[in-house]
Amino acid sequence: GVAASLVMTALGSRVTPETVYWLWGLALLFSLFRIRWMCFAYAAGALGVLQTAASVADGQALERLPDVLARIVHSLQSAHMPSVLALVAVMHLAEEALIRFHGTGLAMPIFVEGKRGKVVGGYQLQGYWPVPLLLLVPASAGALPEGGFALEWPPLFGGGVDAWAWLAFPAMIGFAEQTTAFLPKRKARRTSARLAAYGAVLLAAAAAAEYVPWLALPAACLSVLLHEGLVLWSRLEESASPPRYVHGPTGLMVLGVIPGSPAEALGITAGQTIVRVNGVRVAVKEDLHRALRQNPAYVKLELADENGEIRFMQRALYAGEHHQLGIILAPDEDVSYIVERAERPLAGYVWMKLAGLLRRLPPRAESGKAQRAGNAQGS
């Protein structure tokens, strides 16, 4: 938030409180259909279209409109689209940095249905961060107090503004990706690199719209189209790549390791293949269990990394440690659940959370009967 605020301070901004209301209102409206549409990239695109439509109304037309409707149209007309698009670009650059440094730690192993109906392993990378921003805006912007202060430098989006003030802008950034073809670290790097390119292109489009006003609408549409292009690119890339987390002829594929387990202490990582355990070649999960039972106090492993290079690991085993060393294997046909790939609206996610909470709570009637029965037995 601090870094993004500093960048926006250097650029300047003509975002008014009314524009903030429009962005959040449109984002919440779109989230009713799909949660990922809550991203401000879509709200900025819609705002650009609405502003273009509202700009048709001149002063005489506004006078003939009802007061409330006239205020709405005026708030759309006063939205400074280059500043809005620059804000969206900077937020995606901040998202890129967060994914680059924290994306791998947010990865969670999952089982999903593959292209041919076979269950395969994968990773869900998902993270959300609240980002409080302080925007440098004209001091006369809407509900802001008059006065303000002058700047020692000419901001990019502040031509003709003499006095400035601060505007608090609460924002939320996040991402969600699924991969069955790449290691979590590589997927996070690919996602962050594409977001960096998106932010740079959108920032350049915002700067162009500042000096060529008619470019504001194409730049707003570009905000949506490029964002959808990134989503489509990721899905096509996954669809065209073979699944990585499946068992092969050489051994058992490691999907992940449990933190604090013997597997983590040994240095086992996702994407490695277990070839031999205690000298026994393993092809199915039962082979691994039998090989571990041969020597409950010590284990010797032979693993192949993603390049096919063989690595040898060994370690003493102690009572109470995970029976499978804490290794999460890629799924076989005997799985009890899979993660369904589906895009839900915000209300769907809220309902899922509430339904899960209600399932964990005991029914009132039964809990009351149990309590009365316990009291009767005690007496």
Give the location of each predicted region.
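Generic multipass alpha-helical transmembrane bundles of integral membrane proteins
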Residues: A53-P184
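PDZ-domain C-terminal substructure recognizer with occasional recognition of PDZ-binding tails
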Residues: E238, D287-E333
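Hydrophobic core segments of alpha-helical transmembrane domains in multi-pass membrane proteins
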Residues: T19-A27, A44, V84-M91, W166-P170, ...
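Membrane-helix interface "capping/anchor" motifs
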Residues: F30-A43, Q178-R190
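Long, low-complexity intrinsically disordered regions
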Residues: L325-S379
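PDZ/PDZ-like groove recognition
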Residues: L232-A265
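Conserved PDZ fold ligand-binding element
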Residues: A263-K285
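Interdomain regulatory linker/hinge segments that flank or connect interaction modules
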Residues: L151-F157, G174-E237
